[in-house]
Curated annotation (Swiss-Prot):
Insecticidal neurotoxin that reversibly inhibits the N-methyl-D-aspartate (NMDA)-subtype of ionotropic glutamate receptor (GRIN) and inhibits inactivation of insect sodium channels (Nav). In vivo, is highly toxic to insects. This is U13-ctenitoxin-Co1a. Belongs to the neurotoxin 03 (Tx2) family. 05 subfamily. It is found in: Secreted. Keywords: Disulfide bond, Ion channel impairing toxin, Ionotropic glutamate receptor inhibitor, Knottin, Neurotoxin, Postsynaptic neurotoxin, Secreted, Toxin, Voltage-gated sodium channel impairing toxin. It comes from Ctenus ornatus. The presence of a 'disulfide through disulfide knot' structurally defines this protein as a knottin. Expressed by the venom gland. Disulfide bonds join 3-17, 10-23. GO terms for molecular function: sodium channel regulator activity; toxin activity.
Length: 31
């Protein structure tokens, strides 16, 4: 993944974009 992808190990609403979080997650209201 890239920013905006939803990965199985992450909450679908979590914000990983522009942070130090190692997973890539989508923010539904932005993506």
């Amino acid at each position: 993944g890239k920013c905006g992808d939803i990965n199985a190990g992450c909450s679908s609403d979590c914000d990983c974009c522009g942070s130090s979080v190692t997973c890539d997650c989508a923010i539904r209201k932005k993506f």
